[in-house]
Amino acid sequence: DVRTGALRVQDQGSQLAALALSRVRPAAKSEIWLDLCAGPGGKAALLAAEAQVSGANMVANEVSPHRAKLLEQALDFSGLKAEVVCQDGRDLNLGQFDRIMIDAPCTGLGALRRRPESRWRKKPEDLKELTVLQSELLASAWEHLKPGGVLAYVTCSPHPAETTGVVSSHLAKHKDAELLDAWATLEGISEELIRNENRKTVQLWPHTNDTDAMFISLITKKVG
């Protein structure tokens, strides 16, 4: 049950973020996936399950030793296999990957419906520090993404500075980066989703999607 870790409760938005990366295209058995900011393990467990089904291998990274322990527990309880490492995502000592998930540290404003008190714990100056970190994590992940690979940059925030702002800045700096249509991928996963905006990135909303306000983007690295 939930107390033993055999069952886990996860918002649908978080599930869709993980599934967007795993199902953007069919996976090959030789693929290696990375969850860059994997603790405490909710999305990592779902990704590991998807990787296991497709025959891919997965590495789950978490900079915080405490959260890395929770990550290991989440995977162990689920009976899933993934190599857990504890490194700073901005300075990785790892190889190249076919798919990378970046669930970047953020303000968490997208989860206000579940944690309304968190609005009083955030300050405007927090935003600048977080967007710098988010951009650095995205740049680091890009260096470890194989040509032809796909990266998911997601946040539990609807704030443009943490979402489209970070993605647009990355695309402007990297000519080998191409934004994929994340909406098209999600529409193939859930028939209940209705595209609420005319762009390739996804911003889910509690009042229209009955999820946390999760932002989801998919970026591929061009070959050649």
Segments (PLM) and residue ranges:
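S-adenosylmethionine
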Residues: 1-224
